[in-house]
């Protein structure tokens, strides 16, 4: 089961295997500049996984270990030399974690939380000097990603989630749309709703959902200090 909560800007994946219920929660915090992923289950010691990063095929870079539980990928695009850095750190409850050959291997953990930060050295220069090869070169992504990651890990999952929700909800909850409060369509999956809608079945809730989905996308893709949504 895959869920996207528009109210909290969180993605959730739920599945069962060998009578164990697994859940994976994902959110990206704008205030903290971090992607957070929590893998949990309804029984202890069931987190067995390997985490690795697939590099961009149009860039050249290297992966190095960062301590016992982290990875750092530093690279530059082949066409314009723009530098970027991706950092990953895993925090586990129970079990073991091995950091080897660019992979984080977790065995027998109760829970795993991954923190991911990424940045480039691109600078939005609105008065560029095209004779200067560094006119669009800004911050050092090694430094920014390192600071963001350290801050995120220090805060921990619960504090980051609360900060993320407060930041997002302050924008998302400003608008409510209710086209027909007397019509209820139950908890049909969105895919089934779309099929019914194409066949001419009215679904006011689906129209409300798509309106709010558009707002979610805009809030998630364009904030002060960042690029506009179309970029």
Can you name each region flagged by the protein language model?
Residues 1-231:
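Aromatic-residue-lined binding/catalytic grooves and analogous aromatic/hydrophobic interfacial grooves
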